[in-house]
A protein has these predicted regions:
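Non-catalytic tandem-repeat scaffold regions and their flanking low-complexity/translocation tails
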Residues: 10-166
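Short, low-complexity patches enriched in S/T/P/G
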Residues: 2-12
Length: 166
């Protein structure tokens, strides 16, 4: 009788255990990204209350159609991003923050998206009433440094808007 049992399972099991241990150790010691500074709570509540509904009026429906046309089709992502870029700049001129925020989240290039969201923030920061749109723009940014700078600006602008009121 032959007692050759299958013993080849020990080495792969040990290998998996070592890999799992390394992954766990790295995840524990890896520094997480710092959370951006918080925006003032009343401003955040105003931003959370915003509902984007481009179907609410005829002009919004036209913006929605332009955005859908620019973001779809068989063209290269760079071309789609360029078309969305034009739509965002045009909608910002007309102070249609709903259209500009909708188009901005569809941009695939992270650096372009962050730059355009910063532009939305800049335009929204010119008036106290449009400041909540800046919060939406800041939350759409992917770069943590840009997001921190945006939150700091929002806090500053909110303070200017409410200086003598509190």
């Amino acid at each position: 009788m032959n007692d050759n049992k299958a013993t080849g399972w020990k080495i792969p099991l040990l290998f998996c255990g070592v890999v799992l241990a390394i992954v766990c150790i790295v995840s524990v010691f890896r520094g997480g990204k710092a959370a951006p500074p918080a925006v003032p709570a009343p401003l955040l509540r105003q931003a959370e209350a915003i509902t984007i509904d481009l179907d609410a009026d005829a002009e919004g429906k036209a913006w929605k159609a332009r955005i859908a046309s620019a973001a779809s089709g068989f063209s290269a992502p760079q071309n789609k991003d360029a078309n969305l870029d034009k739509i965002i700049l045009t909608s910002l001129e007309k102070k249609r923050f709903d259209a500009s925020c909708t188009a901005a989240v569809l941009i695939r290039d992270d650096s372009l998206r962050d730059a355009l969201l910063a532009r939305i923030l800049e335009t929204a920061s010119t008036e106290c009433a449009s400041l909540p749109w800046g919060v939406l723009a800041a939350h759409g940014m992917r770069d943590p440094n840009a997001q921190s700078a945006a939150h700091a600006r929002l806090t500053r602008e909110w303070g200017k808007c409410h200086e003598g009121k509190e």
